[in-house]
Structure formats: C-alpha cells, structure tokens
Amino acid sequence: MALWGRSAYRQKTVTSRLTKHRHTSPLNLLNFFIFFSLHLCALFLATAVHYACFACFVLFRHAILLLFYLLARGRASQIQARQKVRCTGATFYRFLIISLSQRAWATKKPI
C-alpha cells in the first residue's frame, strides 16, 4: 500500500537519514580500514624520506668537516716543519680558523 502526500515524504526522508548515518555496515568499516592503512603507509613513507634526507645532510656535513680537518692538519704540519714547533691542538684549531677565513688565509695574519 502506497502512502500519498506529506506523510509519505516525511517517512521517506526519515528512513534515508537513518540509513545514511549508520556506520556499522561492513563496507564502511572496510573503507575506514583502507583509509587508515593508506594514511599509515603515507606517514611511514614521509618519515623514511625525512630520515634519509637528514642522514644525507649529516654525511655531507661530516665530509666537509673532514675536508677542513685534513686541510688544516696539512697546513699545520707544513708550518711545524718550517718552524720546528710542536703541533698541538691549539695550533690545529688556529689553522682551522685560518683556513675557514679567506682574508686571514690571504694575509697570513695571526688570529
């Protein structure tokens, strides 16, 4: 038996609202778990990329510091051979700072 008029429209909208907001269907749960797992994968991937970039940055920084260390050690050993002085840690850091500063390197002024 069909309902006519306003009561039929009300009955139809009430039932559609009830079925629209029901979250217990297996399809909705499946969609939620797919959505959740995709977000976890994206989060894991973003974290992995972030750590890889940070590791590359740290390796690059260490390579530059090692280069400056070797340059300063070579410069300190040249001066040690020329002046017959003992190369201490202070001498190493002095020439590390000299090698980093272009003006001091060019004029060879003491720091």
Curated annotation (Swiss-Prot):
Lipid bilayer topology: Multi-pass membrane protein
Major subcellular site: membrane
Location(s) in or outside the cell: Membrane
Keywords, comma-separated and alphabetical: Membrane, Transmembrane, Transmembrane helix
Domain of life from the UniProt record: Eukaryota
Cellular compartments per GO CC: membrane
Listed transmembrane segments: 29-49, 52-72
Protein name: Uncharacterized protein YJL028W
Source organism per UniProt: Saccharomyces cerevisiae (strain ATCC 204508 / S288c) (Baker's yeast)
